[in-house]
From Swiss-Prot:
The keyword Ribosomal protein applies. One of its GO terms (cellular component) is cytoplasm. GO terms for molecular function: structural constituent of ribosome. The keyword Chaperone does not apply. Belongs to the bacterial ribosomal protein bS16 family. GO terms for biological process: translation. This is Small ribosomal subunit protein bS16.
Length: 83
């Protein structure tokens, strides 16, 4: 079982927001998450990002791999994620 940290789409049509979640890599995008780590609101004036750093670091330590999109969003918001 390969675990990924990725985005889960929520919200209304044309007003999306995303939850940053830990999921099995074989799960569908909007499937059941193992744990929620934070959220990302791309529609807001200032792309709002909030993440629980302790949980994020814990999952990275357990071998979870962040998706490229999650890495880009977090690096853009001064939260350094190693490749």
């Amino acid at each position: 079982m390969s675990v990924r940290i990725r985005l889960k789409r929520m919200g209304a049509k044309k007003r999306p927001y995303y939850r940053i979640v830990v999921m099995d890599s074989a799960s569908p995008r909007d499937g059941r998450a193992i744990e929620e780590l934070g959220y990302y609101h791309p529609v807001e004036m200032q792309n709002q990002v909030k993440i629980n750093e302790d949980k994020f670091r814990d999952w990275i330590g357990k071998g979870a791999i962040p998706s490229d999109t999650v890495k880009r969003i977090l690096n853009k918001n001064n939260f350094k994620v190693e490749s």
